[in-house]
Amino acid sequence: MTAALLPRVGIGVDVHPFSPDRPLWLAGLHWPGEPGLAGHSDADVVIHALCNALLSAAGLGDLGTQFGTAEPEWRDAAGTRLLTETVRLVRDAGYAVGNAAVQLLGERPKLRERRTEAEQLLTETVGAPIALSAATTDGLGFLGRRDGLAAVATALVFPAR
């Protein structure tokens, strides 16, 4: 197999502090009754980490490169809009998404009740299987103090034929 045909892997990370005056969006879903996250767009850490992983795998940089905070059209943008545009950029660069996995890090909200719903939404948006998991830091650090949320993602892309 030549290097041009090898799959590529990307890693993405995103972190946002809580902002109680904003709605919480995670994995493209609204979480009523939970404090939101501060950010230029909707601050959906799950989708932002996924976008970073996809962009990294395709050699396209990261969210800041593609959707910078200096660009007003991305102000308060929905994570699903960013993800749809990211997938378009990845495809335009000549890649197809194989799959991705995202892990949400934080004490709350609890993902388990909405995991299937979130995975379905992400999978439909990307057009490839997306797995979602969660972990806590057992009370350690800013995540353990409930100051914010983080997410880490990996993505696999293949050259489109």
Curated annotation (Swiss-Prot):
EC number: 4.6.1.12
Annotated site location: Transition state stabilizer: 40, 136
One GO MF term attached to the UniProt entry: 2-C-methyl-D-erythritol 2,4-cyclodiphosphate synthase activity
Binding site for 4-CDP-2-C-methyl-D-erythritol 2-phosphate: 14-16, 40-41, 62-64, 142, 145
Residues noted as binding a divalent metal cation in the record, renumbered to the chain: 14, 16, 48
CDD domains: MECDP_synthase
Subunit structure of this chain's protein: Homotrimer.
Native source organism of the sequence: Acidothermus cellulolyticus (strain ATCC 43068 / DSM 8971 / 11B)
Protein name: 2-C-methyl-D-erythritol 2,4-cyclodiphosphate synthase
InterPro entries: MECDP_synthase (IPR003526), MECDP_synthase_CS (IPR020555), MECDP_synthase_sf (IPR036571)
Cofactor(s) required, per the database record: a divalent metal cation
UniProt keyword terms in alphabetical order: Isoprene biosynthesis, Lyase, Metal-binding
Family (UniProt): Belongs to the IspF family.
